[in-house]
C-alpha cells in the first residue's frame, strides 16, 4: 500500500458487507452487488474451488444449502480496495450446523469483483459438544463484537 492509497470508509464497507452477508440467507447473489464476471476463490475445509460470475456464486450457495439458514456479520474491516468480513452462518432444521467464514472482498465501482473465502466447515451439535469438552475456548465464539 502506498501513501496515496486510502481505506474504504467504514459506512460503505459495512453496507457492502451486509448486502454480501444477505446472500447467504437468500441463496441469491442479487443484482447490483456482485459483478457479472466476479472471481471467487473458495477454501472450504480440505478443498479449494474457483468460480466466475455472480450466477455461478448463486448456484454454489444453493448447492451447499440444506434447510433454512441465517447469517450474522461479526466483524467488518475496511481495506484500500474493499473489505474483510467475518460472519457466522447457522443452519436450522433436522441437522443444525454452524460455520464461520472470513471473506476478503475487492470492490470496483461499488460491485464485488473478487472474493476470497475461507470456511471452517459446518460444525454440527456433536462436534460443538466434543469441542467444548476437549478444547475449551479462552474467548468463546461471541456473536457480538
For each feature predicted by the language model, list its residue ranges.
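C-terminal and inter-domain tail/linker signature
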Residues: 1-145
Amino acid at each position: 500500500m502506498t501513501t496515496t492509497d486510502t481505506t474504504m470508509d467504514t459506512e460503505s464497507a459495512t453496507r457492502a458487507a451486509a448486502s454480501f452477508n444477505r446472500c447467504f440467507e437468500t441463496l441469491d447473489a442479487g443484482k447490483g452487488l456482485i459483478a457479472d464476471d466476479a472471481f471467487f476463490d473458495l477454501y472450504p475445509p480440505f478443498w479449494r474451488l474457483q468460480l466466475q460470475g455472480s450466477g455461478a456464486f448463486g448456484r454454489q450457495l444453493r448447492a451447499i444449502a440444506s434447510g433454512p439458514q441465517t447469517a450474522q456479520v461479526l466483524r467488518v474491516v475496511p481495506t484500500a480496495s474493499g473489505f474483510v468480513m467475518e460472519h457466522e452462518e447457522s443452519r436450522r432444521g433436522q441437522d443444525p450446523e454452524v460455520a464461520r467464514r472470513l471473506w476478503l472482498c475487492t470492490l470496483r465501482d461499488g460491485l464485488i469483483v473478487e472474493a476470497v473465502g475461507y470456511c471452517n466447515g459446518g460444525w454440527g451439535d456433536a462436534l460443538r459438544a466434543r469441542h467444548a469438552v476437549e478444547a475449551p475456548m479462552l474467548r468463546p465464539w461471541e456473536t457480538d463484537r
